[in-house]
């Protein structure tokens, strides 16, 4: 079973696929800004019969660094990660939101201490727990002078509040 994980994970098939993709996009115009909505982590955890959706959210967060490194390698200047919408802040159970806040805090802190990346929070802070607000502000402050990949962490974002 270990060999199957090797082939399907970071192993042979992954490396072949990655090489093929990189060859196909070589020389093509690349976007300056990539945005990603991180969705499906709860479904992923449920399909694997994991005891809580937090396992899915953590697994998703664990892949973000790899994704951002790939974006940086490709010369993409700005990445926006849509992590938690204002709609979901009102719709999720408090236990799940507590887990998400901790996961987002850990992510923001880790990203702000890696390389020369610049981390910025976008979205409203009014519904966020104070500890998450503090972590997002600290990450932005710590990286404000960095000149590398610009990462927008969209937490508490949504367009409904802006409709008048």
Question: PLM features: residue spans?
Answer:
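Flexible, compositionally biased loop and terminal segments
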Residues: 1-164
């Amino acid at each position: 079973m270990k060999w199957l994980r090797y082939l399907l994970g970071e192993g042979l098939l992954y490396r072949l696929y990655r090489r093929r993709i990189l060859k196909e996009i070589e020389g093509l115009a690349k976007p300056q800004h990539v945005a990603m909505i991180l969705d499906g982590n709860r479904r992923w955890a449920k399909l694997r019969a994991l005891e809580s959706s937090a396992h899915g959210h953590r697994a998703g967060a664990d892949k973000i660094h790899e994704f951002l490194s790939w974006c940086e390698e490709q010369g993409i200047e700005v990445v926006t990660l849509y992590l938690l919408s204002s709609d979901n802040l009102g719709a999720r159970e408090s236990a799940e939101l507590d887990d998400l806040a901790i996961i987002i805090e850990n992510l923001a802190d880790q990203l702000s201490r890696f390389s020369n990346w610049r981390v910025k929070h976008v979205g409203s802070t009014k519904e966020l727990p104070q500890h998450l607000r503090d972590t997002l502000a600290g990450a932005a402050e710590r990286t404000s002078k960095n000149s590398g990949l610009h990462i927008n962490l969209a937490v508490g974002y949504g367009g409904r509040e802006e409709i008048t």
